[in-house]
Curated annotation (Swiss-Prot):
Residues 139-307 form the PPIase cyclophilin-type domain. InterPro entries: Cyclophilin-like_dom_sf (IPR029000), Cyclophilin-type_PPIase_dom (IPR002130), Cyclophilin_A-like (IPR044666). Was identified as a high-confidence drug target. This is Probable peptidyl-prolyl cis-trans isomerase B. SUPFAM superfamilies: Cyclophilin-like. GO terms for biological process: protein folding. Belongs to the cyclophilin-type PPIase family. The gene is ppiB. It catalyses: [protein]-peptidylproline (omega=180) = [protein]-peptidylproline (omega=0). GO terms for molecular function: peptidyl-prolyl cis-trans isomerase activity. Its EC number is 5.2.1.8.
């Protein structure tokens, strides 16, 4: 909240008194400046937003929003589970969130995968994945990710999120992930993930393209309010980080403890038992400098990602 600045009394006999219209115009300009500043900040950060309350009430009542930064270039200015300006400092003690919805394939699943340019340029030279129709068979693709902290076996859900799997496999085969660090670990009760996939290592890098959300987002209609209500992303989930709808790129996160998120983060696989053991070890070491959100205390570097 801004501070009121004392103003010297005017020397004129009749002080200027702003009209209601002038006060409204001043307030409007102040709000526009605040929104502009926030828009610039949001452009530099990818965010995961956990929303409590109803969208319909947002215009009248401030919903409880707990924001955790995904693309974090200034950890000192944004800490774990940082509330927005008018939000509560703690998540609502609501009933347990529902599970992810059952997967129901659409008629056009994998029929037209597109990877348009993203606002940010590629950190590494990379070719676009195959576009257009991609196969959904085999249903699952086994991948071995090797890190300096141990192996993380992955099973990609090609039958549920084929465009995402197509991109991930393409990047893996081009060596995009080799030598990259997992730049973010969260350990809060609401969110327990290890985030990787950025060659810059600070949460701002990607392959120079983006693509649309798939499961579970595609199980809802576009205007369904449940898209903004938390569901459980269970332990062992492999999902994409994003900066909003349809902005998936190379960054992904691995859930090592049940976490609550709106169903707007594409799930494209699961983590094998060896991978969960590795993640548990990384999580046990905690976040560098303490806290619940930041770089892992134990550096995690991906040495290879290979199809089995």
């Amino acid at each position: 909240m801004g501070h009121l600045t004392p103003v010297a009394a005017p020397r004129l006999a009749c002080a200027f008194v702003p009209t209601n219209a002038q006060r409204r115009a001043t307030a409007k300009r102040k709000l526009e400046r605040q929104l502009e500043r926030r828009a610039k900040q949001a452009k530099r950060r990818r965010i995961l937003t956990i929303v409590g309350g109803s969208l319909a009430a947002v215009a009248v009542i401030v919903a409880v929003v707990v924001t955790v930064v995904v693309n974090k270039d200034d950890h000192q200015s944004t800490t774990s589970a940082t509330p927005t300006d008018s939000a509560s400092t703690s998540p609502p003690q609501a009933a347990t969130a529902p599970p992810l919805p059952p997967f129901k394939p659409s008629a056009n699943l994998g029929a037209n995968c597109q990877y348009p340019p993203s606002p940010d340029k590629a950190v590494k030279p990379v070719k676009l994945p195959r576009t257009g129709k991609v196969p959904t068979d085999p249903a699952q693709v086994s991948v071995s990710m090797v890190t300096n902290q141990g192996n993380i076996g992955l099973m990609l859900a090609n039958n549920e999120s084929p465009c995402t799997v197509n991109s991930f496999v393409s990047l893996a085969q081009q060596g995009f992930f080799k030598g990259t660090t997992c730049h973010r670990l969260t350990t809060s009760p609401m969110l327990a993930v290890l985030q990787c996939g950025d060659p810059k290592g600070d949460g701002t890098g990607g392959p120079g393209y983006q693509f649309a959300n798939e499961y579970p987002t595609d199980q809802y209609s576009a205007n369904d309010p449940k898209l903004n209500e938390p569901v459980i992303y269970p332990r062992g989930t492999l999902a994409m980080a994003n900066a909003g709808p349809n902005t998936n790129s190379s960054q992904f996160f691995m859930v090592y403890r049940d976490s609550k998120l709106p169903p707007q983060y594409t799930v494209f696989g699961t983590i094998q038992a060896d991978g969960l053991t590795t993640l548990d070890k990384i999580a046990k070491a905690g976040v560098a400098g303490g806290g619940e959100d930041g770089k892992p205390a134990t550096e995690v570097t991906i040495t290879s990602v290979l199809l089995d």
